């Protein structure tokens, strides 16, 4: 454990916090084993406690601004769908940056708050090899296929899909 230089009370609090972090990490690992979750290493820390909890996963990544939730969403016809923070080119950070420039941060957050229901209720459309779209009347969610039957949300567009 790293040495913390502070008052005795601060040192005690720091040690307690480190123990809590270790317990949380062990809990996440246990969830991954029980649910057979295989997070993609390139996306960093997996918040396994939000498995199949799209709304919770979204909130967690908005707070942490890094990492992933493997299996944040699930559809019977697709299986698990991962939500990753990503960077400026893909993932949740890309979606927020793009929508914040288009509108403002508040409206961008409101827009992505509908991600869970749009994934559940949208129509599947194959866009190109390795990419699938989930479309609703107002939005298009782009999923990239990663590995064996893993889908990662890479974009969320506001489109008026009149053909649905």
What annotation goes with each model-predicted range?
Residues 1-164:
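Ribonuclease/tRNase effector modules and their secretory precursors
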């Amino acid at each position: 454990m790293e040495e913390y230089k502070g008052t005795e009370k601060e040192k005690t609090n720091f040690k307690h916090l480190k123990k809590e972090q270790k317990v949380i990490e062990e809990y996440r690992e246990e969830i991954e084993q029980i649910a057979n979750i295989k997070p993609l290493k390139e996306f960093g820390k997996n918040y396994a406690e939000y498995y199949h909890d799209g709304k919770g996963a979204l909130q967690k990544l908005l707070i942490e601004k890094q990492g992933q939730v493997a299996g944040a969403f699930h559809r019977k016809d697709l299986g698990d769908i991962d939500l990753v923070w990503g960077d400026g080119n893909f993932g949740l950070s890309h979606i927020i940056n793009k929508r914040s420039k288009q509108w403002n941060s508040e409206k961008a957050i409101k827009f992505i708050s509908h991600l869970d229901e749009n994934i559940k209720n949208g129509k599947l459309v194959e866009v190109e090899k390795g990419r699938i779209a989930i479309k609703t009347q107002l939005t298009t969610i782009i999923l990239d296929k990663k590995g064996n039957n893993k889908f990662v949300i890479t974009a969320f567009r506001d489109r008026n899909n009149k053909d649905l």
